[in-house]
């Protein structure tokens, strides 16, 4: 991945209340740790235990806390802020838009959409997606091989990465990010031991993820036995996590 950011563009992104020390004339073409940064790179101090590494860093631009007082090297710009780590996140968010742009709205010719499904004209439906009967998909992005079950709902501005499965009747809120391979709405683990054998208990509930939920790759969230397994607004779940039914 390649990019080029002027110091002026960096300052526009991180905010106009930053303080400056030193000067760097040129573009930033990389982001690296304090120890590994070279000329033309940007680095930051997010953890106080690495404070001593700032003085020896070769980075051309440094995002630092406001209380940092050491003098920058020649050709080095220090940008001092309340939260350098968050400032870096703002920069990366801007870079992501150009490095990984969202696909344009439209339906790939290999996708299958049931005649009774409703798909927003602002949605992007990727190759080999399958959208079931009665499903509703808002202005979302579905990458390749996503499956949305019968009567499921996907909210606006959500991004479903490759091979995500949304089970029947499940509800995905707005601005969700569901990473590759995660399964929302698989059966909960429900059995009764009857006459010497385990008998399956049907799981007739669903999963509801509220707004701004992130679910990591290959995570499974079980549908409820009845009612809903609810993932609250703003929840962030890592990769390879299993959420049991009715939580």
Question: Residues of each region from the PLM?
Answer:
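Terminal amphipathic alpha-helical/low-complexity segments used for targeting or macromolecular assembly
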Residues: 1-110, 175, 181-182, 187-199, ...
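Structural signal for interior beta-strand "rungs" in well-ordered beta-sheet cores
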Residues: 44, 106-247
